[in-house]
Amino acid sequence: MGGVKHLNEHEETLLLNELIKRGFKIYVKTRMGKKEVVSIKAEKGLVITRTSDGMEIIEAPKNFQRREFIIKPRYPEPNPVAGSSEIYKLLSTKKEIIYREEKVTRVELVNNNLILETDKGHIYILTPSSLFEYPIYTW
């Protein structure tokens, strides 16, 4: 995907918390199933992820940055102006992105539409309202 800028754990926690504030639901996969994230903070060399059921996941930044997050709108249509640009910022930092069971090779933001090009040659133009028709998986 070209010039990928990798976020450190502090930047990533700020970005994920901003998405939560703007009306997105973020889920994390754990050994105990999928959990909804209510907040994430980085402190004293650790990353603490708090889930809706009160559980806290405390881990090293290296493990946190490998964790799988699922991002979905909380309402039928999130704030479209914030949605595309915030999601683009997050996706542009990931090493691997899967959309519709295809590996994404290029991510672009054009006129508030998210453009995803896959290894199978498909180009998906996601408008703010269709942004989360299908889940986007990232690592």
UniProtKB/Swiss-Prot annotation:
This is Uncharacterized protein 3. It comes from Sulfolobus islandicus filamentous virus (isolate Iceland/Hveragerdi). The lineage of its organism: Viruses, Adnaviria, Zilligvirae, Taleaviricota, Tokiviricetes.
